[in-house]
């Protein structure tokens, strides 16, 4: 069984098609990097998997839960809630609650959504903070943290829900350059644990070295995909080669 399976996904904004019948399959334990120019549909695809965007057509399957976007999503609310409990999402701009401490941010999902005992969720949150290198920051507020620290809290928050898959939407693009490495190292650690992840990123070296598979998108379509190292070393499609040209010359 696939961890994620997307079939014939179509998304439009104001009548303009931004995803043209996308098919995507992600296996359990696979790390997939999605690359491509700005406006190519990468983030829209990622947000559609979690139904943060409502597609016009297509099916989205995570584990054994399938959403048919041709049907009214209001009639599938229970299924969508179930799907979201299986999918962690790490946003570009962290999306932490500013008026809550680090610990409160992490335990909210497990306690409110999943009904876990607060003591159990708190113990797990402390473990996760240690895992992402932020032990001792439990009572800090987001505004007191650097961007890199906030993003690592956001990763811990996603992990706290024990998701089957984690989606990362350009997790380093809002960070100062010197803070990028600490977040990438955290994601690299998760990849080594064989967690199922889909990562939209502009960090080409990271995508090549960490992902099992790379997908190049342009103008709302998947142009090319394959083993990450092979795609970066010798892309088959001229458009992929053009996009990667500067990187390949380094």
Swiss-Prot record:
Q: Which InterPro entries match?
A: AAA+_ATPase (IPR003593), ABC_ATPase_HisP-typ (IPR030679), ABC_transporter-like_ATP-bd (IPR003439), ABC_transporter-like_CS (IPR017871), MetN_ABC_transporter-like (IPR050086), P-loop_NTPase (IPR027417)
Q: How is its activity regulated?
A: The TcyJLN system is inhibited by L-cystine, L-cysteine, DL-2,6-diaminopimelic acid and L-cystathionine, and is stimulated by D-cysteine.
| Family matches, as CDD domains | ABC_HisP_GlnQ
Pfam families, per the entry:
ABC_tran
Query: Which membrane topology term applies here?
Result: Peripheral membrane protein
For this chain's UniProt record, which GO biological process terms are given?
cysteine transmembrane transport; L-cystine transport
Name the chemical reaction catalysed here: L-cystine(out) + ATP + H2O = L-cystine(in) + ADP + phosphate + H(+); D-cystine(out) + ATP + H2O = D-cystine(in) + ADP + phosphate + H(+)
GO cellular-component term (any): ATP-binding cassette (ABC) transporter complex, substrate-binding subunit-containing
Give GO terms: molecular function aspect only: ABC-type amino acid transporter activity; ATP binding; ATP hydrolysis activity; L-cystine transmembrane transporter activity
PROSITE patterns attached here? ABC_TRANSPORTER_1, ABC_TRANSPORTER_2
Record-annotated ABC transporter domain positions = 4-244
In a knockout, what does one observe? Disruption of the gene decreases uptake of cystine.
* Keyword Membrane on entry: yes
Q: How does it assemble?
A: The complex is composed of two ATP-binding proteins (TcyN), two transmembrane proteins (TcyL) and a solute-binding protein (TcyJ).
Against PANTHER family, the record matches this protein to: AMINO ACID IMPORT ATP-BINDING PROTEIN, L-CYSTINE TRANSPORT SYSTEM ATP-BINDING PROTEIN TCYN
* Role, per record: Part of the ABC transporter complex TcyJLN involved in L-cystine import. This high affinity cystine transporter is involved in resistance to oxidative stress by forming a L-cysteine/L-cystine shuttle system with the EamA transporter, which exports L-cysteine as reducing equivalents to the periplasm to prevent the cells from oxidative stress. Exported L-cysteine can reduce the periplasmic hydrogen peroxide to water, and then generated L-cystine is imported back into the cytoplasm via the TcyJLN complex. Functions at low cystine concentrations.
Q: Name the chain's protein.
A: L-cystine transport system ATP-binding protein TcyN
